[in-house]
Amino acid sequence: MSSSASTIVAIASAAGIGGVGIVRLSGAQSVQIAAQLGIARMQPRHAHYARFRDGQGAVIDDGIALWFNAPHSFTGEDVVELQGHGSPVLLRQLVARCIELGARQARAGEFSERAFLNGKLDLAQAEAIADLIAAGDLRAARAARRALDGVFSRRVDAVADTLTRLRIHVEAAIDFADEPLDTLGGNQLRDGLGQARNVLAQLLRDAERGRKLRDGLHAVLIGPPNAGKSSLLNALAGSDRAIVTDVAGTTRDTLHEAIQLDGFELTLVDTAGLRDGGDAIEREGMRRARAELERADLALVVLDARDPQAARDAIGDAIDAVPRQLWIHNKCDLLGNAVSLDANAIAVSAVTGQGLEQLHIRLRALALGDGVDSVEGEFSARTRHVQALRRAEQHVDAADLELGFEQLELAAEELRLAHEALGEITGKLSADDLLGKIFSSFCIGK
């Protein structure tokens, strides 16, 4: 079923000048509008050479027209693509002519929205289109491609189906409330719930990895002045991004630099050194450093290997809330003897490069967690997906608790809420305002 009676049009090719430009139409009037442009007797899935004409019969451009008939198209509607020269002036003129003939300018993401509303793909797959377009590296692109192919959605649907079966079992038990739960297969029900919980937990871990692949991680370099934070950022970035001097307090503001770790993006944040005192500007820099820690995924505590206690005194409890930490003993080349370090510490020299390869390995492991080399089956995910999975997990845990007290009605409600949370991921249960927010972030021609 079509999502709208209107026919929409937009430039579908990338902005700017190019060899080829594409204008896309979708809706019931697409073929009629194409005919009025000068493209007669079109056949579905055949390329037609044509001259695209304005209202006075003058040629706007010439090129290829393609008709994808409903429902065998991306949107599920009649779709016509006009491929001409990649001149923004000509493409805008062609869009204007289509609007004169009855189409309207498409909203951002409206083609993908119609594909979703017409059942051509689910919401997670639609989001994967935007992720594929925006992918910053090959690994992220492949993960987005798998999400677009439905790898993520099928796993979500499998868990949702399991919860539905368990809920049916609980609802049936409610009808026999006078019977003890064990006589109604209560042990089997709890076992099934435990298995569903394990599958959901693994899916949540994989989705969190997918979110990291899509968004990257935020790693904050923190420590006392002159520990070598800026030198380390430059060494990891492979360029002189940060100013390095022997003067304590040189870094006054935060500096962000994205690096690639085997196809994974890690944003390093250089910050002002933490210490007591300092002038007003330096104190503001330290305030910003602590603010960066509040949203950090990873704290890289950089200290002078000759005086590690100074870093601990300067930092105090500033990094306690950061989930992952790595203590980096910099300037290890200045030590006469090797030092024994804890498991969450590493010795490096930003100047000589000693230990940097091992640091890359540790950063990669901290970024993606266990199984960093296992890319098979990776899919892209978003923060909202992870949040929905966490809610589902919480409701499954609550259902298990209620079953333990034989509170069947409450257990059934928790299972319903878990199922609802999963439905938000694929769009089977999504509010209109959520859909509007998601599709408005897409390109105009998608």
Curated annotation (Swiss-Prot):
Cofactor note: Binds 1 potassium ion per subunit.
Chief localisation class: cytoplasm
UniProt KW keywords: Cytoplasm, GTP-binding, Hydrolase, Magnesium, Metal-binding, Nucleotide-binding, Potassium, tRNA processing
Annotated S-S bridges: none
Cross-referenced SUPFAM superfamilies: P-loop containing nucleoside triphosphate hydrolases (SSF52540)
Binding site for Mg(2+): S230, T251
Any one biological process term the GO annotation gives: tRNA methylation
Cross-referenced InterPro entries: G_TrmE, GTP-bd, GTP-bd_TrmE_N, GTPase_MnmE, MnmE_dom2, MnmE_helical, P-loop_NTPase, Small_GTP-bd
Domain called TrmE-type G: residue spans: 216-368
UniProt binding sites for (6S)-5-formyl-5,6,7,8-tetrahydrofolate: R24, E81, K120, K446
Named cofactor requirement(s): K(+)
UniProt subcellular location: Cytoplasm
Binding-site list for GTP: 226-231, 245-251, 270-273
Record-listed K(+) binding positions: N226, T245, V247, T250
CDD domains reported for this sequence: trmE, TrmE_N
TM spans (from-to): none
GO molecular function, one term: GTPase activity
Residue stretches in coiled coil: none
One GO CC annotation: cytosol
EC number(s) per entry: 3.6.-.-
Function, in words: Exhibits a very high intrinsic GTPase hydrolysis rate. Involved in the addition of a carboxymethylaminomethyl (cmnm) group at the wobble position (U34) of certain tRNAs, forming tRNA-cmnm(5)s(2)U34.
Family stated for the protein in its record: Belongs to the TRAFAC class TrmE-Era-EngA-EngB-Septin-like GTPase superfamily. TrmE GTPase family.
Subunit-structure text: Homodimer. Heterotetramer of two MnmE and two MnmG subunits.
UniProt protein name: tRNA modification GTPase MnmE
Gene name of this polypeptide: mnmE
